[in-house]
């Protein structure tokens, strides 16, 4: 396609080289902008891809520490923000491209319909003109036979470019359609500019002035034709009355030859005038009939053209709807994939959080268990050391002496020792401890 395009451009005549160079420059700018945008998108996607790879690598070696979990959370938030930003940017770009595409399609369809209208309009108008010209002699339709208002209207059409005001039929019909929709209010200008992208506001305003004058002259033309028809009908009735009167009047023979000659001459003049008036009336009627036939054929052609345009618009709408539906399905599919990836990443994040939490819990339990075991072992070792010390103290070779059970203990002997008075005064009473009942009556050995 590129080779065919370049060969087509460079094989053209030198008269169109300027336009071709402008198109080529515009194309180079568009290519450069597409490359720049592609590089930017690839850079963003590469950054997101690298972040996802880093996250996957981190998830392979999970560490149950708060710092590690916080690091994973920050990485996932960064990836999610990057994906959301990328989606929002692409959505805005996509909407802008859709608007530009719709505008371009409208302009292309309008230009295409204009070209079709020109081709069909020229051929059909030429056929109709030839058919009417073959039926009506040219010398029969003269300006002198038409009313002044009709001549003014025809002159206005010739000077301003016909019934469309130098516009093509498609643009003029859209202008009239929108104007009738708004009933001639000034607010219809904006909608006309939307329907006619190739026209400026000044051109639309000038056409509106022309159309107002066109309607006024056309109304005057209709009124003058109606008045002219009424006058012609009255003249026709007078001529018929004179003719009937002349036919019914008996021919009088006068004696004088001059009177008869004058009377005949007057009758011939009246008849000649009546015939000429009748011929003029017939020629005017014929021209009016031909004009009405031409107008009817134009109306039929306009109806057919409108029907073709309607079918073409329906086809464009159907194609646009199909394309839009495909693009919407593709967008939904991509959005679903991105959402599923985000959900999987969220699940992996939650799983990593749960794993780290379980590992922390298990590690805490393990530490408690180890501490408990260590405490038990320490307690056991201390007990063994204490028992060993006691054994060292207690283990003596003592002979058995059953009689020692009945001997007083060292403490008892110390208690029974006589202790002299320590005070300066006489000791009157020394309190003694109570003797248990089971020892009462037992003689104390000295």
Curated annotation (Swiss-Prot):
It is found in: Cytoplasm, Cytoskeleton, Microtubule organizing center, Centrosome, Centriolar satellite. It comes from the Eukaryota. InterPro entries: CCDC148/CCDC112. Residues 253-272, 390-430 are annotated as: Disordered. One of its GO terms (cellular component) is centriolar satellite. Keywords: Coiled coil, Cytoplasm, Cytoskeleton. Residues 255-268 have a biased composition (Basic and acidic residues). Residues 35-116, 219-400 form a coiled coil. This is Coiled-coil domain-containing protein 112. It comes from Homo sapiens. The lineage of its organism: Eukaryota, Metazoa, Chordata, Craniata, Vertebrata.
């Amino acid at each position: 396609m590129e080779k065919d395009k370049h060969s087509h451009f460079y094989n053209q005549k030198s008269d169109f080289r300027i336009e071709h160079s402008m198109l080529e420059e515009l194309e180079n700018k568009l290519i450069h902008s597409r490359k720049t945008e592609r590089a930017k998108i690839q850079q963003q996607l590469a950054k997101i891809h690298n972040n996802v790879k880093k996250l996957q690598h981190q998830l392979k070696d999970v560490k149950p520490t708060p710092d590690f979990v916080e690091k994973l959370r920050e990485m996932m938030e960064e990836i999610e923000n990057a994906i959301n930003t990328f989606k929002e940017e692409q959505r805005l770009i996509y909407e802008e491209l859709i608007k530009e595409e719709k505008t371009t399609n409208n302009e292309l369809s309008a230009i295409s319909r204009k070209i079709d209208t020109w081709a069909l309009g020229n051929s059909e108008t030429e056929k109709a003109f030839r058919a009417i010209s073959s039926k009506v002699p040219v010398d029969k339709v003269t300006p002198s036979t038409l009313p002044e208002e009709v001549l003014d209207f025809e002159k206005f059409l010739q000077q301003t470019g016909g019934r469309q005001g130098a516009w093509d039929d498609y643009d003029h019909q859209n202008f009239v359609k929108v104007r009738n929709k708004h009933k001639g209010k000034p607010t219809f200008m904006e909608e006309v500019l939307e329907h006619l992208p190739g026209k400026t506001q000044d051109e639309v305003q000038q056409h509106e002035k022309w159309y107002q004058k066109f309607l006024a002259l056309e109304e005057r033309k209709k009124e003058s034709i109606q008045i002219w028809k009424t006058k012609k009908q009255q003249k026709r009735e007078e001529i018929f009355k004179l003719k009937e009167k002349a036919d019914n009047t008996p021919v009088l023979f006068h004696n004088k030859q001059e009177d008869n000659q004058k009377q005949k001459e007057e009758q011939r003049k009246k008849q000649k005038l009546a015939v000429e008036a009748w011929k003029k009336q017939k020629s005017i009627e014929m021209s009016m009939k031909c004009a009405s036939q031409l107008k009817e054929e134009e109306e039929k052609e306009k109806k057919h053209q409108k029907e073709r345009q309607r079918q073409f618009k329906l086809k464009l709408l159907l194609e646009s709807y199909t394309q839009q539906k495909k693009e919407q399905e593709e967008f939904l599919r991509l959005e679903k994939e991105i959402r599923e990836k985000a959900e999987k990443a969220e699940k992996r994040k939650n799983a990593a959080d749960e794993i780290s939490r379980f590992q922390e819990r298990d590690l805490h339990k393990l530490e408690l268990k180890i501490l408990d075991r260590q405490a038990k072992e320490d307690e056991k070792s201390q007990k063994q050391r204490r028992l060993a010390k006691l054994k060292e103290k207690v283990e003596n070779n003592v002979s058995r002496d059953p009689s020692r059970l009945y001997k007083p203990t060292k403490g008892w002997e110390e208690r029974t020792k006589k202790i002299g008075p320590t005070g300066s005064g006489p000791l009157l009473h020394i309190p003694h401890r109570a003797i248990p009942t089971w020892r009462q009556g037992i003689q104390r050995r000295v």
